[in-house]
Amino acid sequence: VSMPLVTTTEMFQKAYEGGYAIGAFNVNNMEIVQGITEAAKEVSSPLILQVSAGARKYAKHGYLMKLVEAAVEDTGLPIALHLDHGEDFAICKACIDGGFTSVMIDGSKHSFADNIALTRQVVEYAHQHGVVVEGELGRLAGIEDDVNVSAEDSSYTDPNQVEEFVRATGVDSLAIAIGTSHGAYKFK
Protein backbone atom coordinates (compact mmCIF):
# COMPACT_ATOMS: atom_id res chain seq x y z
CA VAL A 1 0.00 0.00 0.00
CA SER A 2 1.56 3.26 -1.09
CA MET A 3 1.26 6.57 0.71
CA PRO A 4 -1.35 8.91 -0.69
CA LEU A 5 -0.55 12.38 -1.93
CA VAL A 6 -0.61 14.97 0.84
CA THR A 7 -1.90 18.53 0.92
CA THR A 8 0.32 21.58 1.04
CA THR A 9 -1.44 22.63 4.25
CA GLU A 10 0.02 19.62 6.07
CA MET A 11 3.43 20.24 4.50
CA PHE A 12 3.54 23.94 5.26
CA GLN A 13 2.59 23.39 8.91
CA LYS A 14 5.39 20.86 9.41
CA ALA A 15 7.87 23.06 7.55
CA TYR A 16 6.89 26.10 9.61
CA GLU A 17 7.29 24.16 12.85
CA GLY A 18 10.57 22.62 11.65
CA GLY A 19 12.02 25.81 10.21
CA TYR A 20 12.62 24.55 6.68
CA ALA A 21 11.46 25.29 3.14
CA ILE A 22 9.81 22.96 0.64
CA GLY A 23 10.75 22.95 -3.02
CA ALA A 24 8.04 23.22 -5.64
CA PHE A 25 9.02 22.00 -9.10
CA ASN A 26 7.13 22.09 -12.37
CA VAL A 27 7.05 18.69 -14.07
CA ASN A 28 5.96 17.56 -17.51
CA ASN A 29 7.58 14.18 -18.22
CA MET A 30 8.95 11.03 -16.65
CA GLU A 31 12.59 12.11 -16.59
CA ILE A 32 11.83 15.35 -14.77
CA VAL A 33 9.58 13.61 -12.24
CA GLN A 34 12.24 10.95 -11.65
CA GLY A 35 15.10 13.42 -11.34
CA ILE A 36 13.30 15.63 -8.86
CA THR A 37 11.92 12.82 -6.73
CA GLU A 38 15.19 10.88 -6.65
CA ALA A 39 17.04 14.00 -5.49
CA ALA A 40 14.38 14.64 -2.84
CA LYS A 41 14.63 11.02 -1.69
CA GLU A 42 18.41 11.37 -1.20
CA VAL A 43 17.82 14.18 1.31
CA SER A 44 14.49 12.87 2.68
CA SER A 45 12.69 16.03 1.62
CA PRO A 46 8.97 16.48 1.07
CA LEU A 47 8.17 18.19 -2.20
CA ILE A 48 5.51 19.81 -4.29
CA LEU A 49 5.19 18.67 -7.88
CA GLN A 50 3.52 21.38 -9.95
CA VAL A 51 1.75 20.95 -13.26
CA SER A 52 1.17 23.89 -15.57
CA ALA A 53 -1.42 24.20 -18.32
CA GLY A 54 1.35 23.52 -20.83
CA ALA A 55 2.37 20.33 -19.03
CA ARG A 56 -1.23 19.10 -18.94
CA LYS A 57 -1.54 19.79 -22.66
CA TYR A 58 1.81 18.12 -23.45
CA ALA A 59 1.77 15.09 -21.16
CA LYS A 60 -1.97 14.65 -20.56
CA HIS A 61 -3.59 14.39 -17.14
CA GLY A 62 -3.73 10.60 -16.89
CA TYR A 63 -0.06 10.11 -17.70
CA LEU A 64 1.02 12.78 -15.21
CA MET A 65 -1.10 11.21 -12.46
CA LYS A 66 0.47 7.79 -13.02
CA LEU A 67 3.98 9.30 -12.97
CA VAL A 68 3.28 11.08 -9.70
CA GLU A 69 1.65 7.99 -8.17
CA ALA A 70 4.77 6.00 -9.12
CA ALA A 71 6.98 8.67 -7.53
CA VAL A 72 5.03 8.53 -4.26
CA GLU A 73 5.19 4.73 -4.22
CA ASP A 74 8.89 4.63 -5.14
CA THR A 75 10.09 7.28 -2.69
CA GLY A 76 7.65 7.06 0.23
CA LEU A 77 8.01 10.84 0.49
CA PRO A 78 5.24 13.28 1.32
CA ILE A 79 4.38 14.69 -2.11
CA ALA A 80 1.70 17.22 -2.98
CA LEU A 81 0.41 17.60 -6.53
CA HIS A 82 -0.33 21.22 -7.40
CA LEU A 83 -1.94 22.88 -10.42
CA ASP A 84 0.22 25.90 -11.25
CA HIS A 85 -1.59 28.97 -12.59
CA GLY A 86 -5.02 27.54 -13.31
CA GLU A 87 -6.69 30.18 -15.43
CA ASP A 88 -10.35 29.36 -14.89
CA PHE A 89 -12.80 27.38 -12.78
CA ALA A 90 -13.04 24.53 -15.32
CA ILE A 91 -9.32 23.69 -15.26
CA CYS A 92 -9.23 23.86 -11.46
CA LYS A 93 -12.31 21.63 -11.19
CA ALA A 94 -10.81 19.09 -13.61
CA CYS A 95 -7.63 18.89 -11.53
CA ILE A 96 -9.55 18.68 -8.24
CA ASP A 97 -11.75 15.90 -9.64
CA GLY A 98 -8.66 14.23 -11.11
CA GLY A 99 -6.74 13.83 -7.85
CA PHE A 100 -4.66 16.97 -7.35
CA THR A 101 -4.24 17.96 -3.70
CA SER A 102 -3.68 21.65 -4.39
CA VAL A 103 -4.66 24.12 -7.11
CA MET A 104 -3.75 27.68 -7.91
CA ILE A 105 -6.42 29.86 -9.42
CA ASP A 106 -4.75 32.78 -11.13
CA GLY A 107 -7.37 35.48 -11.48
CA SER A 108 -4.75 38.22 -11.50
CA LYS A 109 -5.60 39.33 -15.04
CA HIS A 110 -9.10 40.21 -13.86
CA SER A 111 -10.31 43.17 -11.82
CA PHE A 112 -9.95 42.88 -8.05
CA ALA A 113 -13.69 42.14 -7.67
CA ASP A 114 -13.72 39.55 -10.46
CA ASN A 115 -10.55 37.92 -9.08
CA ILE A 116 -12.28 37.60 -5.70
CA ALA A 117 -15.42 36.08 -7.27
CA LEU A 118 -13.48 33.56 -9.38
CA THR A 119 -11.14 32.61 -6.55
CA ARG A 120 -14.05 32.20 -4.12
CA GLN A 121 -15.82 29.88 -6.59
CA VAL A 122 -12.72 27.66 -6.80
CA VAL A 123 -12.23 27.72 -3.01
CA GLU A 124 -15.82 26.64 -2.35
CA TYR A 125 -15.52 23.67 -4.72
CA ALA A 126 -11.98 22.68 -3.69
CA HIS A 127 -12.63 22.77 0.05
CA GLN A 128 -15.63 20.44 -0.39
CA HIS A 129 -13.11 17.95 -1.80
CA GLY A 130 -10.30 18.49 0.71
CA VAL A 131 -8.15 20.35 -1.81
CA VAL A 132 -6.01 23.37 -0.92
CA VAL A 133 -6.27 26.60 -2.94
CA GLU A 134 -3.63 29.21 -3.71
CA GLY A 135 -4.83 32.54 -5.08
CA GLU A 136 -2.85 35.23 -6.88
CA LEU A 137 -2.92 38.95 -6.32
CA GLY A 138 -0.75 41.15 -8.55
CA ARG A 139 0.82 40.09 -11.86
CA LEU A 140 4.34 38.78 -12.37
CA ALA A 141 6.25 39.97 -15.41
CA GLY A 142 7.75 37.36 -17.72
CA ILE A 143 6.75 34.37 -19.81
CA GLU A 144 5.14 31.20 -18.53
CA ASP A 145 3.29 28.71 -20.75
CA ASP A 146 3.32 31.17 -23.65
CA VAL A 147 1.60 33.82 -21.54
CA ASN A 148 3.71 36.93 -21.81
CA VAL A 149 3.13 39.64 -19.21
CA SER A 150 5.12 42.74 -20.09
CA ALA A 151 6.76 44.86 -17.44
CA GLU A 152 4.16 47.54 -18.21
CA ASP A 153 1.28 45.11 -17.60
CA SER A 154 2.76 43.60 -14.47
CA SER A 155 1.67 44.96 -11.13
CA TYR A 156 2.90 44.59 -7.59
CA THR A 157 0.50 43.18 -5.06
CA ASP A 158 -1.21 46.03 -3.23
CA PRO A 159 -0.62 45.29 0.48
CA ASN A 160 -3.84 47.14 1.29
CA GLN A 161 -5.85 44.55 -0.69
CA VAL A 162 -4.29 41.39 0.77
CA GLU A 163 -6.35 41.07 3.94
CA GLU A 164 -9.63 41.77 2.13
CA PHE A 165 -8.75 39.29 -0.65
CA VAL A 166 -7.87 36.48 1.76
CA ARG A 167 -10.93 37.10 3.92
CA ALA A 168 -13.33 37.36 0.95
CA THR A 169 -11.99 34.30 -0.88
CA GLY A 170 -10.97 31.89 1.88
CA VAL A 171 -7.72 30.96 0.07
CA ASP A 172 -5.26 28.79 1.95
CA SER A 173 -2.21 30.55 0.51
CA LEU A 174 -1.49 33.53 -1.68
CA ALA A 175 1.00 34.17 -4.48
CA ILE A 176 2.07 37.78 -4.50
CA ALA A 177 4.00 39.91 -6.98
CA ILE A 178 6.86 41.71 -5.27
CA GLY A 179 9.25 42.19 -8.17
CA THR A 180 9.87 38.57 -9.08
CA SER A 181 9.39 37.35 -12.64
CA HIS A 182 8.59 34.21 -14.60
CA GLY A 183 10.75 32.60 -17.23
CA ALA A 184 14.27 31.69 -18.16
CA TYR A 185 16.64 34.57 -18.69
CA LYS A 186 20.05 34.72 -20.29
CA PHE A 187 22.42 37.04 -18.54
CA LYS A 188 25.39 38.60 -20.32
Regions found by a protein language model. Give the residues of each.
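Alpha/beta enzyme core
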Residues: 6-14, 29-55, 61-78, 86-188
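Terminal or standalone catalytic/regulatory effector modules within metabolic enzymes
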Residues: 19-21
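Short, Lys/Arg-enriched N-terminal segments with co-localized hydrophobic residues
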Residues: 1-2
